[in-house]
Regions:
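Glycosyltransferase donor-sugar binding loop
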Residues: 43-44, 186, 212, 236-254, ...
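Membrane-proximal helix-turn-helix segments that form the acceptor-binding/catalytic region
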Residues: 116, 142-158
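Helix-loop-beta element that forms the nucleotide-linked donor phosphate-binding surface
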Residues: 162, 166-186
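Aromatic "clamp/platform" in nucleotide-sugar-dependent glycosyltransferases that forms part
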Residues: 292
Length: 384
């Protein structure tokens, strides 16, 4: 079975949704599936240099191969004419395409090419069909959907959602297409040295609250910061993440902290990867993500995998898994509910530890790439 994964970018700066493709591809290759990834060399949207990678030739990695193509002519939108030309020429070599992201020109055009070449394809929306997300640039998206995404959805072999709630709430533009619900997996590198506290000025004698995600309005920082400012408990807040697509919003959040009472109890560490990311997740007593909408929440699963309990909103679409497994605390998207959840979580260290253990067990059983790969393979086989 030969599968083509198409994704606008796999640069680290785009976070979990892009990195998921690498984890899935590695697990599928390990299970004997021939995997090719077609992507661009995009490495951020504002001023960053593109990835320094070979272009248009296969690059071997973890049992699969990657073709990188130059972003041109619309670099900001991760568009590549060369990728589309390659796909048109090589689509017959594959049994199925798994296309990641909607409302992204290279993905949308790839789906249209796959359809014209009779190559079955699965679409993974990455939360772009959430009604809240569709409100952003609403008129443009309605036009885009009418011209491109509605035919793409109608012609897809299946739509890949990562949670039951995402499947339930997503807009289909009056199309009827098979749903498949397949969660995302986590695979963290070994933890860095124990010097993480010293490096970032994180005290060892206070509860650590960690926010690790893209610094974006949808992540609920406008709720979290006022809650922390008035929480009254003794804690230290770690803000980890960045936003190369909207650096002005990131700067606004940094300034808000700098000029508030949180200044002396906050470490702003920026975008972290590798062993340092793992070390921060392990060092945290609570992982906090009060998003307004989140189709899965890969960072939540990563925190759970190292035994850190989570405090999340009921708009993170795996919240019911967290609630059933008692892996953390659930809040509504308002200041009062989030305050109550954090106070309850901080009040009982014994309960924190127990819910952290529950989280790790649940993640091992449900967010393992090897187990998820078997579900994905069965789905591929059903669709080919």
């Amino acid at each position: 079975m030969k599968i083509l994964q198409i994704v606008p970018s796999i640069s680290l700066v785009y976070g979990g949704p892009s990195q998921m493709v690498l984890g899935l591809s590695s697990a599928l290759a390990k299970a004997g599936v021939e995997i090719t990834i077609a992507t661009t060399n995009s490495n951020g949207d504002v001023g960053q240099a593109p990835l320094d990678v070979p272009l248009g030739v296969p690059v071997a990695q973890n049992g699969y191969e990657i073709y990188y193509f130059r972003c041109s002519p619309f670099r900001r939108y991760k568009f590549s004419i060369e990728l589309l030309q390659w796909l048109h020429k090589n689509s017959k070599a594959y049994d199925l395409a798994h296309i990641h992201a909607l409302f992204s020109p290279v993905s949308s055009c790839s789906a249209a090419i796959a359809r014209s070449q009779q190559l079955p394809y699965i679409l993974r929306p990455l939360g772009t069909l959430d009604p809240a997300d569709l409100q952003k640039k609403r008129q443009l998206k309605r036009l885009y959907a009418a011209v491109l995404e509605r035919p793409n959805l109608a012609g897809a072999a299946a739509i890949h959602f990562t949670s039951e709630q995402e499947a339930k709430t997503s807009e289909r533009f009056n199309t009827v297409t098979r749903d498949v619900v397949l969660p995302l997996g986590v695979s963290l590198p070994p933890s860095a040295s124990s010097s993480i506290h010293e490096k970032y000025g994180i005290p060892k004698n206070k509860p650590i609250l960690l926010f690790m995600s893209r610094i974006d309005p949808k992540k609920g920082l406008d709720l979290l910061l006022p809650v922390l400012e008035n929480l009254g408990s003794d804690f230290h807040f770690v803000l980890a993440g960045g936003n190369p697509q909207d650096p002005s919003y990131e700067a606004t959040i940094r300034d808000r902290i700098q000029y508030s009472q949180l200044k002396d109890k906050t470490s702003i560490v920026g975008f972290v990867t590798g062993g340092e990311k793992t070390a921060l997740l392990e060092a945290a007593d609570l992982f906090v993500l009060p998003s307004y909408y989140e189709n899965f929440g890969i960072a939540v699963a990563e925190a759970m995998s190292v035994g850190t309990p989570v405090v999340i909103s009921d708009q993170v679409h795996i919240w019911q898994d967290i609630e059933r497994s008692r892996s953390g605390w659930i809040a509504q998207c308002n200041v009062e509910s989030l305050t109550q959840a954090l106070k309850e979580a901080l009040a009982n260290r014994v309960e924190q530890i127990q819910r952290g253990k529950n989280a790790q067990i649940f993640a091992q059983q449900n967010y393992s790439w090897d187990a998820i790969a078997q579900q994905v393979i069965k789905t591929y086989q059903d669709l080919i």
